[in-house]
Amino acid sequence: MEKNLPDIFFFPNCVNVFSYKYSQDEFSNMSKTERDSFSLAVFPVIKHRWHNAHVVKHKGIYKVSTEARGKKVSPPSLGKPAHINLTAKQYIYSEHTISFECYSFLKCITNTEINSFDEYILRGLLEAGNSLQIFSNSVGKRTDTIGVLGNKYPFSKIPLASLTPKAQREIFSAWISHRPVVLTGGTGVGKTSQVPKLLLWFNYLFGGFSTLDKITNFHERPVILSLPRIALVRLHSNTILKSLGFKVLDGSPISLRYGSIPEELINKQPKKYGIVFSTHKLSLTKLFSYGTLIIDEVHEHDQIGDIIIAVARKHHTKIDSMFLMTATLEDDRERLKVFLPNPAFIHIPGDTLFKISEVFIHNKINPSSRMAYIEEEKRNLVTAIQMYTPPDGSSGIVFVASVAQCHEYKSYLEKRLPYDMYIIHGKVLDIDEILEKVYSSPNVSIIISTPYLESSVTIRNVTHIYDMGKVFVPAPFGGSQEFISKSMRDQRKGRVGRVNPGTYVYFYDLSYMKSIQRIDSEFLHNYILYANKFNLTLPEDLFIIPTNLDILWRTKEYIDSFDISTETWNKLLSNYYMKMIEYAKLYVLSPILAEELDNFERTGELTSIVREAILSLNLRIKILNFKHKDDDTYIHFCKILFGVYNGTNATIYYHRPLTGYMNMISDTIFVPVDNN
């Protein structure tokens, strides 16, 4: 469907687009093209104003029940009006008088082509649209946006590139075409903060109709923005809630979905046309109940995110529109061209608002000498922070590979630098409190972080990035540190230059960068289980295909050996984390055990019942050797004796030396097997 967005339906960015009510005199002075723009108002008016409305007679004049109170009456016969009263907004016949809006209400019936609308219908649609506050203009003021979506406060002023008229037209044309859309944008253009809001607006106006060429029945469904982490769900939903003029969730178009969500973050009066911010896992549970699907952070290749893309592509007729948003297409453009059916690529150009200077600090040690490389890196980092120091009251972010390195580098820096030091990563619970300290401190703050800060939280006062160029890539029963990809570098660099000029200091040779194929270092059971649930053909229906297909087929055989029906697996997928696939054998035993095991997965509380149940699975690990690490830690070199990765080597830390065997309770809890 080729449709251009008329100017009168732009979302009010409160910079050069404002909410506006048009007068009948203005309509009279418009060109035919401008007048015809109002024909599209029939769709939001039918949904939000005329749904369940009827004709009444009010003070002798026929009106719509949404205009005035009155007794329900049979509609009058309509021919060409004898007279038009622009001031009273009424059509006058010899026997009766009818409001502009009521005339349009009676004329706009199912299957009517919108290009057949005459001036009389368009004038009524103008009045109905004014009542809904759906129109916009290049003149106005912020306060005119109060009430547009039921909001008590005005929309935020947004000068970002994604809400310019040009970008709005391009995004609308892609959305209404029903083609899959891949959207990229420069740093700070508002991909995540504004594009979902724009798609919410389009959904409010036109969502649910199969065509915008004629009047049809509609099936209203919300938009969903699917995100890889709870922190992102909370951050972006709050940003958009406030920018739309709301202070509370209830009754707003914003809803949140993630596991163990607190009561106060549940919208008890959601809008059918609204937008749901959800973690990937919960998005999958009701994927086809949404009209527009937005998948963010595609470049991260979160496992469930990649599965959503595969499912949406397989069942694209069940979704009206799909948007994939990514920081960069460096690694994925060619695959997306082949994988998606006739995709549209949209790039919103934009650079950081302020200049970013780059500084390279050379490490003279080869990375193959891991410990020596890291020691040299830490020395270089101290020198770099001394030479390139954030101003007082500002902050710098040090990107390291892992949580353990956060603590290692913080301890090292604290002994050598006089600045405030903080750690932020995905497992830190009091991030808001830490940021309050960072923002209120008159001193320099240095934040040591994992890749979590690439996108999860925006630090307002950051001026410097110190990038070690590493990421920890988890693997079954282990993992490894790898150099980052270009997309990760771009994300890290883009943390500065938004509010002030920034400096990006990097400590790695650019030739070390490489694409990271995460699927080759993941447990693959989710791909099997969701493929069964959504009838995907493996491996060709997967967005990213594993390099070693033998592991995929071994995983399938292992899952089949559990002797659990597809229907039961689907229930387990919808209700439980199953951080270890073997837990499925316990979830099906009894509701009481399932409840306690679920609580363990969510909170870490290990009851004796759950402990004994997991031990009964005999998830055994053989200890090959050990060595002393420090006062209370021993490194054990082991071999996995169960599951798909039977025979895989693993390294496990324990507070005393062990021999023989241990049983696995979770990825962090191990129980020695009694040798007696």
Curated annotation (Swiss-Prot):
Gene Ontology cellular-component annotations: virion component
Effect of T326A: Defect in RNA unwinding
Tree of life domain: Viruses
Reactions catalysed: ATP + H2O = ADP + phosphate + H(+)
Effect of D296A: Strongly reduces NTPase and helicase activities
Effect of K191A: Inactivates ATPase and helicase activities
UniProt effect for mutating R229A: Inactivates ATPase and helicase activities
Pfam families noted in UniProt: DEAD, Helicase_C, NPH-II
TM stretches of this protein: none
Family matches, as PANTHER family: ATP-DEPENDENT RNA HELICASE, ATP-DEPENDENT RNA HELICASE DHX37-RELATED
Protein name as annotated: RNA helicase NPH-II
